[in-house]
Regions:
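Extracytoplasmic copper-binding redox domains, predominantly the cupredoxin/blue-copper superfamily
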Residues: 19-195
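Bacterial N-terminal signal peptides that target proteins for export
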Residues: 1-8
Length: 195
């Protein structure tokens, strides 16, 4: 019943998300802050449940059934998180989001926290997708294939680094969410740079 819960993002990757800025080095910004996109997926059970040998490529210990049970009991899964989940920075600084787990994640700026873009997870959690789940054309994909914007622009696959440039981090509070695992939140508070 829940076999396709995490499948959709991997199809998006295969269809052209590889064009995302990856493993970017430090820019000329005064400082770069690091956030890790973490999970603890156990590859054998996740890959079998999702019928996808690349659904989980990490070395975690949480089985697929344990993850679903935690999701149903707690509304989240332990160790699926952004670390840190709160950050204070100054204008002109950047953020690098590093995929250190075994699953595909997004680090998508949202107006408000809410449901993600995976129907099965939203159904389990009784959530409504955030507006940022609106599909966009996948670059390089045939036949007008579309995917949620975050899967295309804000992807953080395992072992990949997404850079959030200083230009997107204006003064104020910015909310970021994984559009696959919607309990993964981060808040970034940006203050004006010191002169």
């Amino acid at each position: 019943m829940y076999g396709k819960v995490f499948f959709v993002p991997f199809a998006a990757v295969a269809l052209g998300v590889a064009g995302i800025p990856a493993a970017a080095g430090h820019s000329s910004s005064p400082r770069t802050h690091v956030i890790e996109a973490q999970d603890d997926c156990e590859p054998t059970s996740f890959n079998a449940a999702l019928n996808d040998p690349t659904a989980c490529v990490g070395g975690g210990e949480t089985t697929f059934d344990e993850a679903i049970a935690q999701l149903l009991d707690d509304g989240e899964v332990d160790d699926w998180e952004f670390d840190p989940d709160e950050l204070k920075i100054r204008t002109g600084e950047t953020i690098e989001v590093r995929g250190v787990g075994g699953e595909f994640h997004t680090f998508t700026k949202v107006k408000e926290f809410g449901g993600g873009c995976v129907k099965e997870i939203n159904d389990l959690l009784k959530l409504t997708p955030v507006a940022e789940c609106e599909p966009v054309q996948v670059p390089g994909a045939p036949n007008g294939v579309k995917a949620p914007r975050g899967f295309v622009e804000d992807a953080v696959p395992p072992s990949v680094t997404l850079t959030v440039p200083a230009a997107k981090l204006t003064p104020g509070t910015h909310k970021f969410e994984c559009l696959i695992h919607p309990w993964m939140h981060a808040e970034v508070k940006v203050r004006a740079a010191r002169h």
